[in-house]
Amino acid sequence: MSNNMAKIAEARKTVEQLKLEVNIDRMKVSQAAAELLAFCETHAKDDPLVTPVPAAENPFRDKRLFCVLL
């Protein structure tokens, strides 16, 4: 009997999840890819991995030189 109740509970969870998912707006993968590509091309100039930060503006560069003796 408990096995049957567990299956019913699982089916109810599945139905509730499907009710939530039915209202999700969807788009074609080709449209999403085109929008992503356009976004990347638009913001490429601001991306430090695509356009390196000039050394003078790099906040992570070493501030002073030092010598390590071995």
Curated annotation (Swiss-Prot):
Gene: GNG8
Residues making up the propeptide: 68-70
Subcellular compartments: Cell membrane
PANTHER family assigned to the protein according to its UniProt record, in alphabetical order: GUANINE NUCLEOTIDE-BINDING PROTEIN GAMMA SUBUNIT
One GO CC term on file: heterotrimeric G-protein complex
Role played: Guanine nucleotide-binding proteins (G proteins) are involved as a modulator or transducer in various transmembrane signaling systems. The beta and gamma chains are required for the GTPase activity, for replacement of GDP by GTP, and for G protein-effector interaction.
SUPFAM superfamilies: Transducin (heterotrimeric G protein), gamma chain
Subunit details: G proteins are composed of 3 units, alpha, beta and gamma.
Gene3D superfamilies membership: Transducin (heterotrimeric G protein), gamma chain (4.10.260.10)
Gene Ontology MF, one: G-protein beta-subunit binding
An example Gene Ontology biological process: nose development
Record key words, sorted: Cell membrane, Lipoprotein, Membrane, Methylation, Prenylation, Transducer
Protein origin, superkingdom: Eukaryota
Lipid-attached positions, S-geranylgeranyl cysteine: 67
Cited PROSITE patterns: G_PROTEIN_GAMMA
Modified residues (Cysteine methyl ester): 67
The keyword Repeat belongs to this UniProt entry's keyword annotation: no
Protein family according to the UniProt entry: Belongs to the G protein gamma family.
InterPro entries associated with the record: G-protein_gamma-like_dom, GGL_sf, Gprotein-gamma
Membrane-protein topology: Lipid-anchor
Protein name, per record: Guanine nucleotide-binding protein G(I)/G(S)/G(O) subunit gamma-8
Annotated organism of origin: Homo sapiens (Human)
Keyword Membrane attached: yes
